[in-house]
């Protein structure tokens, strides 16, 4: 809605028949969204909300090339971007510090960091600054058994950050989640009432995870066939069959945190 749709609508208003972007994805004659050839740069995860009509009007020239090939072509044509480092910032704020960006618009609400036994082991600067599974910048030291501390949850009602020791703590793992705002690029694969077996990415650059997806009213019930670490509400669950991106949904709720227990 913000970038792709606005750009496409503007291009059509100018009388263009197609628009081109630099995303590392591919399409076919059916208007399907396919992974980019370069597995390290594939960006289909970010475009799952598009539909076939939009994709038929889009061209992705670099989707069939690796990033190395793209840089080589840019260098051969004297384009200065050939030496530019890969961007790692959030696209709409650039390379600015993300914490500083948030603090400009959202007032911080400091609170306690709480261990599984209920003890306060530290203090946080605001829940918005932390993500499930985070280890760095917690500032917890001098307590516990010497292992690193990780964020295992957020108690929004009491403004508490829940933390525990060990990167494989059971509370970091789950297998069942609810997805909302489901978007399908083509036909709805659940329209017939049968569950969908496919693969899923719960975050960018994650390897393919086998899942079974069922309709649950207006939402999706996503069952990961292996325990998943640090699946977080607000993330996108994006579904694939081979090279084809089917669509996805926003993770709304984790149903069984701690149930997909790993050996620790």
Briefly describe each language-model feature range.
Residues 1-258:
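Nucleotide-activated chemistry modules centered on ATP-dependent adenylation/adenylyltransferase
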